Amino acid sequence: MAQGHYELKTAKDGQFMFNLIATNGQVILTSELYKTKAAAQNGIASVQKNGVDEKNFEFRMTKSDQPYFVLKATNHQEIGRSQYYSSQAAAQKGMESVMNNASTEVIKEI
């Protein structure tokens, strides 16, 4: 079965971040900024571990009533968050896509 991949990149300010990309090329999870590449790589490892378990996801709403979700580690720290969706059903599908792709070991540095 085809799986997505992680894109690890340097932000404009020199910090590091990553996206989890689905098989269709869509960004399905975006990390916070990390001061070091090693810290970002640890973040990816945390998504690989925690992103396969539905209990680690939390659904939220923006002020304009757009649903999105965050992925949390076992220590309750946020690891990544989704885009904003048009419906709760779409956000649910996004979460399922993260769960299906999180365990990929493919990391592309861009």
Positions of PLM-derived features:
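Charged, low-complexity amphipathic helices and coil/IDR segments
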Residues: 2-4, 104
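Short arginine-rich
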Residues: 48-56, 99-108
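A structural feature that tracks compact, well-ordered secondary-structure segments
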Residues: 7-9, 15-23, 28-34, 43-47, ...
